[in-house]
């Protein structure tokens, strides 16, 4: 049961899905799309970035805020990256393989391509692009999908280059890895047609399914990201970036609605109190010279403790806006853009070693009343000043309403401030890449793959898989291998579709949970295992042990693994003698249990011959011997 009536609240939401394409080369150079270990980096360099003007002479507001603090961006390069990633060489021609894949995606969403595609530069000065911009090209529009809550329009599809991956932050320096920079991706943006958290997940799932249906997108953590645009009536549009887990989307929408509602409640109370923000910044360093608070002592060593007074904000700065996050957290997020660690506010004091006496002395010194709140920042003088100014601005916004902003998704479904929403000044033409003609003939030549949902239905109807198994294999990364093996063993009595599917989406995950490095398993390994079963060299019960062994030692052949495990085929006479001897030894038990003795005795036989002989054959031989013993008795 949902907490809110989202229709009544006027919820509007849309998604932007960013999916890496599995092309051989990057978008504007011929480097491979390989993800490398940071330890493999063979050189590094650094950059300082600043906001530049658009063709209209304007600077993007998001870029301006991000460059207030001078940061050093360090880039790790590899023998699989080149001067294009370093921004030391102009980009090459746009990757035609990536363009073909993107047009195929556009077809699946019933979109209309542009007649002529132009590459643009999108200003990005967070260090994730060495050039200070991301190359992007608008490719198609006017698509749609059908959902349980009606049609959801697909507004646009763009082809973009992936950003560099952030490795870590050290002080004012940020380290990025260039292996990911330039990998082709598609950005799919929906219209604000999403009506509820569950609807958001449904739309995201469907778009993800369509993308995977191409068989030409990368898989794994970080290869697909969802941005969510959300607003409610009387609220504001907020873009939440970097939702990597599908399971988080519903929580993100719910908690953003909750945040905006709580901010509206706080605004109403501020208006009723006739609250306002004083712009004067006070130097409170001298008040805390003898403080016992270690955090304030560190601030004094850095240079300054600055404070600001928020008239009639007392009690509201500590008001919760999301689970575990308060209005004060919103203030702190803004302050952090100046490079400080956070803020102190009187709604949470005394605390952190700061005494009640020190808080009162601060109130007296700056003329704060009991119903006022005070904000403090302890850091270098310039950082502290910028941080306090950012908090003052955010406090004013709390009175005015909800600010439009870009926020980042947190692991618990909450969000934190990143930067203002970018404006039109963010985009300008890329003059180093020629435009590309998209003719109707070219678009018509792009083949459209079968959707995974349709493929699952086909597997169930044509291959005899149950619905659950058909869906699992259709959505699995092993889909191409499954189809190849299915074709090879279409008329084989020992290897059928169910055995192949259960191996790939049942046994493989199980041995992975048990610690096996299943990424070591190749198509050749699986082909060899099923060939051995087909030739009756091993029984299907041996699959788990055999794959575990191959995952541990991927360099050995299937035949070597069979030999190492002692799984070579047994002489039928040897099996028959074992069963006869066991039946004689267990004669009293068989007389007592009769035919019901089959189950317990089968366990003994399987322990001896598991993986070496098909269980059905063993069961048949044992039953025959038990029946013979009972009849003779």
From Swiss-Prot:
Xref: Pfam families: GAD (PF02938), GatB_N (PF02934), GatB_Yqey (PF02637)
Enzyme Commission number(s) from the entry: 6.3.5.-
Cleavable signal peptide: none
Protein function: Allows the formation of correctly charged Gln-tRNA(Gln) through the transamidation of misacylated Glu-tRNA(Gln) in organisms which lack glutaminyl-tRNA synthetase. The reaction takes place in the presence of glutamine and ATP through an activated gamma-phospho-Glu-tRNA(Gln). The GatDE system is specific for glutamate and does not act on aspartate.
Keyword Nucleotide-binding: yes
Domain of life: Archaea
Protein source organism: Methanosarcina mazei (strain ATCC BAA-159 / DSM 3647 / Goe1 / Go1 / JCM 11833 / OCM 88)
This protein's encoding gene: gatE
Entry similarity comment: Belongs to the GatB/GatE family. GatE subfamily.
GO CC list: cytoplasm
Keyword line: ATP-binding, Ligase, Nucleotide-binding, Protein biosynthesis
Classification via HAMAP family: GatE (MF_00588)
InterPro entries: Asn/Gln-tRNA_amidoTrfase_suB/E, Asn/Gln-tRNA_Trfase_suB/E_cat, Asn/Gln_amidotransferase, Asn/Gln_tRNA_amidoTrase-B-like, GAD-like_sf, GAD_dom, GatB_C_1, GatB_Yqey_C_2
Catalytic reaction equation(s): L-glutamyl-tRNA(Gln) + L-glutamine + ATP + H2O = L-glutaminyl-tRNA(Gln) + L-glutamate + ADP + phosphate + H(+)
Protein name: Glutamyl-tRNA(Gln) amidotransferase subunit E
């Amino acid at each position: 049961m949902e907490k809110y009536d989202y229709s009544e609240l006027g919820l509007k939401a849309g998604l932007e899905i960013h999916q890496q394409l599995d092309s051989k080369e990057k978008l504007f150079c011929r480097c491979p799309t390989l993800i490398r270990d940071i330890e493999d980096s063979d050189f590094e360099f650094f950059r300082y970035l600043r906001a530049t003007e658009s063709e209209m002479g304007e600077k993007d507001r998001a870029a301006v805020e991000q460059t207030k603090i001078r940061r050093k961006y360090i880039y790790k390069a590899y023998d699989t990256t080149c001067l294009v990633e370093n921004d030391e060489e102009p980009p090459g021609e746009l990757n035609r393989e990536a363009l073909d894949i993107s047009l195929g995606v556009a077809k699946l969403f019933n979109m209309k391509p542009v007649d002529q595609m132009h590459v643009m530069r999108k200003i990005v000065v967070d260090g994730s692009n060495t050039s200070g911009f991301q190359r992007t090209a608008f490719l198609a529009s006017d698509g749609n999908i059908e959902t349980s809550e009606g049609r959801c329009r697909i507004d646009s599809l763009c082809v973009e280059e992936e950003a560099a991956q952030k490795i870590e932050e050290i002080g004012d320096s940020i380290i990025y890895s260039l292996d990911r920079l330039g990998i082709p991706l598609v950005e799919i943006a929906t219209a604000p047609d999403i009506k509820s958290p569950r609807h958001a997940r449904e739309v995201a799932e469907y778009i993800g399914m369509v993308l995977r249906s191409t068989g030409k997108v990368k898989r794994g953590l970080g290869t697909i990201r969802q941005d969510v645009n959300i607003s409610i009536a009387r609220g504001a549009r907020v873009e939440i970036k970097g939702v990597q887990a599908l399971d988080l989307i519903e929580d993100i929408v719910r908690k953003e609605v909750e945040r905006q509602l709580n901010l509206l409640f706080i605004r109403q109370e501020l208006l009723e109190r006739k609250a306002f923000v004083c712009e004067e910044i006070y130097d409170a360093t001298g008040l805390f010279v003898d403080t016992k608070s270690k955090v304030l002592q560190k601030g004094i060593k850095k240079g300054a403790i600055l404070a600001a007074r928020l008239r009639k904000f007392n009690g509201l700065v500590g008001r919760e806006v999301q689970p575990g996050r308060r209005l004060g957290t919103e203030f702190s997020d803004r302050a952090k853009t100046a490079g400080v660690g956070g803020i102190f506010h009187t709604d949470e004091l005394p605390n952190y070693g700061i005494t009640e006496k020190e808080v009162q002395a601060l109130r007296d010194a700056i003329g704060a009343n009991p119903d006022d709140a005070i904000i403090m920042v302890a850091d270098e003088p310039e950082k502290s000043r910028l941080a306090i100014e950012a908090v003052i601005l955010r406090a004013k916004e709390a009175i005015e309403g909800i600010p439009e902003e870009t926020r980042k998704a947190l692991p618990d479904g909450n969000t934190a401030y990143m930067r203002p929403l970018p404006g039109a000044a963010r985009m300008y033409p890329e003059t180093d890449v020629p435009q590309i003609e998209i003719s109707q003939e070219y678009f018509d030549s792009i083949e459209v793959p079968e959707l995974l949902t349709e493929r699952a239905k086909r597997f169930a109807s044509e291959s005899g898989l149950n619905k659950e198994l058909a869906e699992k294999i259709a959505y699995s990364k092993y889909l191409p291998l499954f189809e190849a093996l299915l074709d090879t063993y279409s008329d084989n009595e020992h290897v059928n579709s169910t055995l192949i599917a259960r191996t790939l989406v049942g046994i493989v995950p199980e041995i992975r949970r048990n610690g096996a490095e299943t990424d070591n398993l190749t198509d050749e390994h699986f082909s060899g295992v099923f060939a051995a079963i087909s030739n009756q060299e091993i029984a299907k019960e041996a699959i788990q042990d055999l794959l575990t062994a191959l995952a541990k030692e991927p360099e050995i052949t299937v035949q070597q693994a069979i030999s190492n495990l002692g799984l070579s085929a047994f002489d039928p006479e040897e099996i028959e003698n074992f069963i006869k001897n066991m039946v004689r030894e267990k004669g009293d038990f068989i007389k007592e249990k009769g035919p019901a003795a089959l189950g317990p005795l089968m366990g003994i036989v399987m322990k001896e011959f598991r993986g070496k002989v098909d269980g059905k054959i063993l069961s048949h031989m044992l039953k025959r011997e038990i029946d013979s013993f009972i009849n003779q008795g």
